[in-house]
């Protein structure tokens, strides 16, 4: 059977870059990793509680963390940053305070920057959130998949593959359904592919959503 590898890790150093940039002593590495997890969870929870688009999406594509001895720089890539910036100017400061409290960083400065993404629906995370919202509202999975593909086509991507697994439409037996549009060359290392896996809780149980987007050839 085919051995499936994570498309992002497979391409690290060629078309993908790390989302965390820092160095640590081997003994302290796990602490740094845990700190990153806390930062990401804290930001996602804050956005989930305070800012939600009508469709129930957070709109975060990715969070990059850069650390130096005296500074932690966090860059949040958002598809819809207006929600965080224009709503209340103090929202970013409040988020910064929350993260600082969570980390308890006394002697390090913390900076949060928000960057807008030009094509939000070209990002697998945002698309997965969109599909999850549709499935929670009991929209048929085929409709949700097709709508997601339509949105991606507007973002000028070269190909997309969407897979949903679990008790689809509340059926007794779990199954896997997928749909592909355009090219998705998973074997080609030079192909820039974005990938995300996302779990969504519906009234029938947990569904897994996986999305591969072929952005461009390097």
Curated annotation (Swiss-Prot):
It comes from Arabis hirsuta. Keywords: Chloroplast, Plastid, Ribonucleoprotein, Ribosomal protein, RNA-binding, rRNA-binding. The lineage of its organism: Eukaryota, Viridiplantae, Streptophyta, Embryophyta, Tracheophyta. PANTHER family: 30S/40S RIBOSOMAL PROTEIN S3, SMALL RIBOSOMAL SUBUNIT PROTEIN US3C. GO terms for biological process: translation. The keyword Transferase does not apply. One of its GO terms (cellular component) is chloroplast. Gene3D superfamilies: 3.30.300.20, Ribosomal protein S3, C-terminal domain. Belongs to the universal ribosomal protein uS3 family. SUPFAM superfamilies: Prokaryotic type KH domain (KH-domain type II), Ribosomal protein S3 C-terminal domain. Its main location: plastid. InterPro entries: KH_dom-like_a/b, KH_dom_type_2, KH_sf_prok-type, Ribosomal_S3_C_sf, Ribosomal_uS3_bac-typ, Ribosomal_uS3_C, Ribosomal_uS3_CS. It comes from the Eukaryota. Pfam families: Ribosomal_S3_C. This is Small ribosomal subunit protein uS3c. The gene is rps3. It is found in: Plastid, Chloroplast.
